[in-house]
């Protein structure tokens, strides 16, 4: 079997470094390119330098050259560069795995349009455990559909720039969908001052940013006399990186828009 050629965007970032390691660890993949922004101090360095690997791949800012020798790009950067990379992937017929969060509706629409011409796995979280949690939340919300107040609490490291996290928002979307609600209409993001009694139809969000928290997410269903808490805690970014590489292998040869539920076969159950 010919190894799948994977390029990493943001290769010198916290997530990018772990992705380089994950590609190196997978028996069916090989690192074909590593991208960083123009002016990065890492340009020219071996992509594996930060994790003690010698990959033979130099970090570059030449998107066209990197994609020309790749089957798939994994991108966990920020919305603006991801959308630029996405258009290049469409031009070069390269699949893309998108772990970037914080897209507005226009950005999401661009991803949907691009999926008509290339294979895309776009997910708020690539952890197997988190995606199983999404599946569980759908069932729980359908059962606890009356008389329960729903709150979502998430925590991440001090460097995370978007809030709530994409994973927390996806949890909210799953729960709202199971209840027949529109998250845009029922979400409450933080509370301050005299807020009055809680509206039972709302889904609340609370955000923590501190230290080096990799990712903590809890969905709380509370009523008089009991509460149900469903929690996922990530202790290593390798959880997300390994899932992204798994998605890259899975989407090879496919066209269309998929998420991690598709990769794991959970959408067929």
Curated annotation (Swiss-Prot):
NAD(+) binds at residues 10-15, 36, 99-101, 123-126. It comes from Neisseria meningitidis serogroup B (strain ATCC BAA-335 / MC58). One of its GO terms (cellular component) is cytosol. One of its GO terms (molecular function) is 4-hydroxy-tetrahydrodipicolinate reductase. The active site is at 156 (proton donor/acceptor), 160 (proton donor). This is 4-hydroxy-tetrahydrodipicolinate reductase. The gene is dapB. It catalyses: (S)-2,3,4,5-tetrahydrodipicolinate + NAD(+) + H2O = (2S,4S)-4-hydroxy-2,3,4,5-tetrahydrodipicolinate + NADH + H(+); (S)-2,3,4,5-tetrahydrodipicolinate + NADP(+) + H2O = (2S,4S)-4-hydroxy-2,3,4,5-tetrahydrodipicolinate + NADPH + H(+). Keywords: Amino-acid biosynthesis, Cytoplasm, Diaminopimelate biosynthesis, Lysine biosynthesis, NAD, NADP, Oxidoreductase. It is an enzyme of class 1 (oxidoreductase). PROSITE patterns: DAPB.
């Amino acid at each position: 079997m010919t190894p799948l050629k994977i390029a990493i965007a943001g290769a010198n970032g916290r997530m990018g470094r772990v992705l380089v390691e994950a590609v190196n660890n997978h028996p069916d993949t090989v690192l074909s390119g590593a991208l960083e922004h123009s002016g990065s101090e890492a340009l020219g360095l071996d992509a594996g330098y930060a994790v003690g690997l010698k990959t033979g791949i130099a970090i570059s800012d030449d998107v066209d050259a990197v994609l020309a020798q790749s089957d798939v790009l994994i991108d966990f950067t920020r919305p603006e560069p991801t959308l630029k990379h996405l258009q290049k992937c469409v031009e070069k017929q390269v699949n893309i795995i998108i772990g970037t969060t914080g897209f507005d509706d226009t950005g999401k629409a661009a991803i949907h349009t691009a999926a008509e011409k290339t294979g895309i796995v776009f997910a708020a979280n690539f952890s197997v455990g988190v995606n199983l949690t999404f599946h569980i939340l759908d069932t729980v919300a359908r059962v606890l559909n009356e008389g329960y107040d729903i709150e979502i609490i998430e925590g991440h490291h001090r460097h995370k720039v978007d809030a709530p996290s994409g994973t927390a928002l996806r949890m909210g979307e799953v729960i709202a969908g199971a209840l027949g609600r529109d998250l845009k209409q029922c979400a409450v993001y933080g509370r301050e001052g005299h807020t009055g009694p809680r509206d039972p139809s709302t889904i609340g969000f609370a955000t923590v940013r501190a230290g080096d928290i990799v990712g903590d997410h809890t969905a709380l269903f509370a009523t008089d006399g009991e509460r149900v808490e469903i929690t996922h805690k990530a202790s290593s970014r390798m959880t997300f990186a390994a899932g992204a590489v798994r998605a890259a292998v899975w989407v090879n040869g496919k066209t269309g828009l998929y998420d991690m539920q598709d990769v794991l076969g959970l959408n067929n159950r």
